[in-house]
Protein backbone atom coordinates (compact mmCIF):
# COMPACT_ATOMS: atom_id res chain seq x y z
CA UNK A 1 0.00 0.00 0.00
CA UNK A 2 1.38 3.37 -0.98
CA UNK A 3 1.92 5.73 1.92
CA UNK A 4 -0.10 8.93 1.52
CA UNK A 5 -0.85 10.17 5.04
CA UNK A 6 1.99 10.60 7.51
CA UNK A 7 2.51 11.97 11.00
CA UNK A 8 5.75 13.77 11.82
CA UNK A 9 6.88 14.08 15.43
CA UNK A 10 9.61 16.69 15.95
CA UNK A 11 8.60 18.73 12.90
CA UNK A 12 9.90 22.03 14.29
CA UNK A 13 13.50 20.88 14.80
CA UNK A 14 16.26 21.57 12.28
CA UNK A 15 15.72 18.31 10.39
CA UNK A 16 11.99 18.30 11.11
CA UNK A 17 11.33 21.56 9.27
CA UNK A 18 13.04 20.44 6.06
CA UNK A 19 11.46 16.97 6.28
CA UNK A 20 8.04 18.58 6.68
CA UNK A 21 8.60 20.90 3.71
CA UNK A 22 9.87 18.08 1.49
CA UNK A 23 6.98 15.82 2.52
CA UNK A 24 4.35 18.42 1.63
CA UNK A 25 6.11 19.16 -1.66
CA UNK A 26 6.16 15.42 -2.43
CA UNK A 27 2.39 15.27 -2.04
CA UNK A 28 2.04 13.63 1.36
CA UNK A 29 -0.85 14.65 3.60
CA UNK A 30 1.09 15.57 6.72
CA UNK A 31 -0.09 15.80 10.33
CA UNK A 32 2.28 17.25 12.92
CA UNK A 33 2.21 17.32 16.71
CA UNK A 34 3.76 20.52 18.04
CA UNK A 35 3.87 22.14 21.44
CA UNK A 36 3.89 25.61 19.89
CA UNK A 37 2.36 26.12 16.45
CA UNK A 38 4.20 29.45 16.07
CA UNK A 39 7.39 27.44 15.51
CA UNK A 40 5.99 26.22 12.20
CA UNK A 41 6.99 28.39 9.21
CA UNK A 42 4.47 31.08 8.29
CA UNK A 43 5.35 30.74 4.60
CA UNK A 44 6.11 27.85 2.30
CA UNK A 45 4.78 24.28 2.50
CA UNK A 46 2.36 23.79 5.38
CA UNK A 47 1.16 20.60 7.07
CA UNK A 48 -2.43 19.60 6.31
CA UNK A 49 -3.19 19.10 10.01
CA UNK A 50 -1.61 20.57 13.14
CA UNK A 51 -2.22 19.00 16.56
CA UNK A 52 -1.06 21.25 19.39
CA UNK A 53 0.05 19.09 22.27
CA UNK A 54 2.90 17.09 23.75
CA UNK A 55 4.45 13.77 22.76
CA UNK A 56 4.45 12.86 26.46
CA UNK A 57 0.63 13.02 26.51
CA UNK A 58 -0.75 9.75 25.15
CA UNK A 59 -4.05 11.33 24.05
CA UNK A 60 -2.23 13.97 21.96
CA UNK A 61 -0.11 11.29 20.29
CA UNK A 62 -3.17 9.11 19.66
CA UNK A 63 -4.96 11.98 17.93
CA UNK A 64 -1.89 12.60 15.74
CA UNK A 65 -1.42 8.95 14.69
CA UNK A 66 -5.09 8.15 13.98
CA UNK A 67 -5.71 7.66 10.26
CA UNK A 68 -2.06 7.71 9.19
CA UNK A 69 -0.24 5.30 6.90
CA UNK A 70 3.19 5.82 8.50
CA UNK A 71 5.03 7.81 11.16
CA UNK A 72 8.30 9.78 11.09
CA UNK A 73 10.02 10.45 14.41
CA UNK A 74 12.52 13.31 14.66
CA UNK A 75 12.28 13.96 18.38
CA UNK A 76 15.18 15.84 19.90
CA UNK A 77 16.16 18.03 22.82
CA UNK A 78 17.48 20.98 20.77
CA UNK A 79 20.57 22.15 22.63
CA UNK A 80 19.57 20.74 26.01
CA UNK A 81 22.06 17.99 26.82
CA UNK A 82 20.77 17.21 30.33
CA UNK A 83 19.36 13.76 31.20
CA UNK A 84 16.00 13.17 29.52
CA UNK A 85 13.38 10.54 28.83
CA UNK A 86 11.34 12.64 26.37
CA UNK A 87 12.41 10.65 23.32
CA UNK A 88 11.94 7.18 24.81
CA UNK A 89 8.69 8.03 26.60
CA UNK A 90 7.45 9.73 23.45
CA UNK A 91 8.34 6.61 21.48
CA UNK A 92 6.32 4.47 23.91
CA UNK A 93 3.27 6.65 23.29
CA UNK A 94 3.85 6.56 19.53
CA UNK A 95 4.12 2.75 19.50
CA UNK A 96 0.94 2.39 21.57
CA UNK A 97 -0.97 4.73 19.25
CA UNK A 98 0.33 3.00 16.14
CA UNK A 99 -0.79 -0.39 17.45
CA UNK A 100 -4.18 1.03 18.45
CA UNK A 101 -4.75 2.44 14.97
CA UNK A 102 -3.17 -0.32 12.86
CA UNK A 103 -0.26 1.82 11.62
CA UNK A 104 2.79 -0.39 11.13
CA UNK A 105 5.60 1.70 9.55
CA UNK A 106 7.85 4.00 11.56
CA UNK A 107 11.04 5.77 10.51
CA UNK A 108 12.89 7.25 13.49
CA UNK A 109 16.08 9.27 13.80
CA UNK A 110 18.57 8.73 16.62
CA UNK A 111 22.30 9.18 16.00
CA UNK A 112 25.42 7.44 14.77
CA UNK A 113 26.62 7.15 18.36
CA UNK A 114 24.42 4.04 18.55
CA UNK A 115 26.74 2.44 15.97
CA UNK A 116 29.89 3.33 17.92
CA UNK A 117 31.75 1.79 20.79
CA UNK A 118 29.67 3.12 23.73
CA UNK A 119 32.85 4.15 25.56
CA UNK A 120 33.69 6.57 22.71
CA UNK A 121 30.58 8.74 23.11
CA UNK A 122 31.63 12.27 24.20
CA UNK A 123 30.67 12.65 27.88
CA UNK A 124 28.56 15.77 27.26
CA UNK A 125 26.41 13.81 24.78
CA UNK A 126 26.06 10.71 26.95
CA UNK A 127 22.71 11.60 28.55
CA UNK A 128 20.99 12.32 25.23
CA UNK A 129 22.58 9.22 23.69
CA UNK A 130 21.29 7.12 26.59
CA UNK A 131 17.73 8.19 25.76
CA UNK A 132 18.34 7.55 22.06
CA UNK A 133 19.34 4.01 23.06
CA UNK A 134 16.16 3.62 25.12
CA UNK A 135 14.03 4.97 22.25
CA UNK A 136 15.69 2.62 19.75
CA UNK A 137 15.01 -0.34 22.07
CA UNK A 138 11.32 0.61 22.41
CA UNK A 139 10.93 0.81 18.63
CA UNK A 140 13.05 -2.25 17.85
CA UNK A 141 11.02 -4.41 20.24
CA UNK A 142 7.66 -3.02 19.09
CA UNK A 143 7.07 -5.54 16.30
CA UNK A 144 6.43 -2.64 13.91
CA UNK A 145 8.22 -2.10 10.60
CA UNK A 146 10.94 0.12 12.02
CA UNK A 147 13.70 1.89 10.11
CA UNK A 148 16.40 3.14 12.48
CA UNK A 149 18.11 6.20 10.98
CA UNK A 150 21.43 6.87 12.72
CA UNK A 151 23.02 9.91 11.09
CA UNK A 152 26.49 11.34 11.70
CA UNK A 153 26.95 15.10 12.19
CA UNK A 154 23.97 16.93 10.68
CA UNK A 155 25.09 19.86 8.53
CA UNK A 156 23.43 22.65 6.60
CA UNK A 157 24.65 21.85 3.08
CA UNK A 158 22.12 21.96 0.21
CA UNK A 159 20.01 18.98 -0.79
CA UNK A 160 21.87 16.59 -3.12
CA UNK A 161 19.85 13.36 -2.98
CA UNK A 162 23.18 11.69 -3.76
CA UNK A 163 24.09 10.43 -0.29
CA UNK A 164 25.31 6.93 0.54
CA UNK A 165 23.25 4.67 2.81
CA UNK A 166 25.20 2.12 4.84
CA UNK A 167 23.24 -0.66 6.54
CA UNK A 168 24.11 -1.71 10.09
CA UNK A 169 27.43 0.11 10.19
CA UNK A 170 29.18 3.39 9.52
CA UNK A 171 29.75 4.77 6.05
CA UNK A 172 32.39 6.73 4.14
CA UNK A 173 31.62 10.19 5.51
CA UNK A 174 31.06 11.79 8.92
CA UNK A 175 28.35 14.25 7.80
CA UNK A 176 24.86 14.39 6.29
CA UNK A 177 23.01 17.58 5.44
CA UNK A 178 19.69 18.09 7.22
CA UNK A 179 18.04 18.35 3.79
CA UNK A 180 19.49 15.04 2.61
CA UNK A 181 18.58 13.48 5.96
CA UNK A 182 14.98 14.61 5.50
CA UNK A 183 15.04 13.29 1.94
CA UNK A 184 16.20 9.91 3.22
CA UNK A 185 13.55 9.76 5.98
CA UNK A 186 10.91 10.16 3.25
CA UNK A 187 12.65 7.69 0.95
CA UNK A 188 12.26 5.07 3.68
CA UNK A 189 8.47 5.40 3.31
CA UNK A 190 8.61 4.24 -0.31
CA UNK A 191 10.51 0.98 0.20
CA UNK A 192 10.76 -1.90 2.66
CA UNK A 193 14.48 -2.48 1.99
CA UNK A 194 15.48 -0.63 5.18
CA UNK A 195 12.84 -2.12 7.49
CA UNK A 196 14.51 -3.73 10.50
CA UNK A 197 17.89 -2.16 9.73
CA UNK A 198 20.04 0.53 11.26
CA UNK A 199 20.82 2.98 8.46
CA UNK A 200 23.67 5.48 8.25
CA UNK A 201 23.16 8.13 5.55
CA UNK A 202 26.25 10.20 4.74
CA UNK A 203 27.79 12.20 1.90
CA UNK A 204 31.11 13.76 0.91
CA UNK A 205 30.02 17.37 0.39
CA UNK A 206 32.19 19.65 -1.71
From Swiss-Prot:
GO molecular function, a single term: FMN reductase (NADH) activity
GO CC aspect terms: cytoplasm; cytosol; extracellular exosome; intracellular membrane-bounded organelle; nucleoplasm; plasma membrane
UniProt keywords, alphabetically: Cytoplasm, NADP, Oxidoreductase, Phosphoprotein, Transferase
A biological process term (GO) from this entry: heme catabolic process
EC number: 1.5.1.30, 1.3.1.-, 2.6.99.-
Entries under InterPro entries matching the protein: NAD(P)-bd_dom, NAD(P)-bd_dom_sf, Polyketide_Oxido-like
Tissue specificity statement from the Swiss-Prot or TrEMBL entry: Predominantly expressed in liver and erythrocytes. At lower levels in heart, lung, adrenal gland and cerebrum. Expressed in adult red blood cells.
Effect of residue 109 to R: Abolished S-nitroso-CoA-dependent nitrosyltransferase activity
UniProt-annotated catalytic positions: 109, 188
Reactions accelerated catalytically: reduced riboflavin + NADP(+) = riboflavin + NADPH + 2 H(+); bilirubin IXbeta + NADP(+) = biliverdin IXbeta + NADPH + H(+); FMNH2 + NAD(+) = FMN + NADH + 2 H(+); FMNH2 + NADP(+) = FMN + NADPH + 2 H(+)
Effect of residue 78 to A: Induces both an increase in active site micro-millisecond motions and an increase in the rate constants of coenzyme-binding
Statement: the UniProt record of this protein carries the keyword Flavoprotein: no
Regulation: Mesobiliverdin acts as a competitive inhibitor for flavin reduction, indicating that flavin and tetrapyrrole substrates compete for the same site. Inhibited by a wide range of xanthene-based drugs, such as phloxine B, erythrosin B, tamibarotene, sulfasalazine, olsalazine, febuxostat, ataluren (PTC124) and deferasirox.
Consequence when changing residue 111 to L: Risk factor for thrombocytosis; enhanced generation of reactive oxygen species (ROS) leading to impaired megakaryocyte differentiation; abolished NAD(P)H-dependent reductase activity
Effect of residue 153 to A: Reduced affinity for biliverdin
Family the UniProt entry places it in: Belongs to the BLVRB family.
Summary of subunit composition and partner proteins: Monomer.
Name the record gives this protein: Flavin reductase (NADPH)
Native source species: Homo sapiens
Gene (name only): BLVRB
Amino acid sequence: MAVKKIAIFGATGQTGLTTLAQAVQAGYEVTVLVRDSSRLPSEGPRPAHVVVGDVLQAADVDKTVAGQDAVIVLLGTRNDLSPTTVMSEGARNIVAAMKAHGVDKVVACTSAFLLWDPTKVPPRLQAVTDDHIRMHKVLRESGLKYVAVMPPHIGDQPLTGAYTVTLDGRGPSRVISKHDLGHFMLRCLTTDEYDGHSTYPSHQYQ
